[in-house]
């Protein structure tokens, strides 16, 4: 995996193009906001080659009450994740595990499966009462 990623990285640099890839996460009980490179089923060494690594996992609707989000990274007020009446809508946590260009936030996305529309809602975190 690392060898293939290195070859693709060299091609991207040489031709000034973006190359994106999707890798499977392990089946685990890790909370979406706590994802790390160890939750990837592929070779962990692939991270060394990547410029950016985003780990994305669906948030279980039964656990929406454990999370809150805001439009600013350090906010005074946070919003609840509102369950959608639309059965095609899902919420996803995106943990930026590596970013050579800057910050590594944890973001909340809303996905409409019917239209494949991803909407970034803001910065996601566990509510204070659910922190270890």
What are these regions (language model features)?
Residues 16-24:
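Structural recognition of the conserved hydrophobic beta-strand(s) that form the central parallel beta-sheet
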């Amino acid at each position: 995996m690392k060898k293939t990623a290195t070859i693709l990285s060299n091609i991207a640099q040489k031709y000034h193009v973006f190359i994106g890839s999707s890798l499977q996460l392990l089946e685990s009980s890790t909370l979406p906001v706590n994802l790390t490179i160890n939750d990837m089923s592929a070779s962990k060494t692939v991270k060394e080659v990547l410029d950016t690594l985003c780990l994305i996992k669906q948030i279980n609707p039964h656990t929406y009450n454990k999370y809150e989000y805001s439009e600013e990274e350090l906010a005074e007020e946070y919003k609840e994740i509102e369950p959608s009446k639309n059965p095609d809508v899902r919420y996803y946590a995106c943990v930026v595990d590596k970013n050579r260009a800057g910050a590594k936030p944890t973001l909340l996305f809303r996905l409409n499966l019917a239209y494949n529309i991803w909407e970034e809602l803001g910065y996601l975190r566990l509510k204070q009462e659910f922190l270890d």
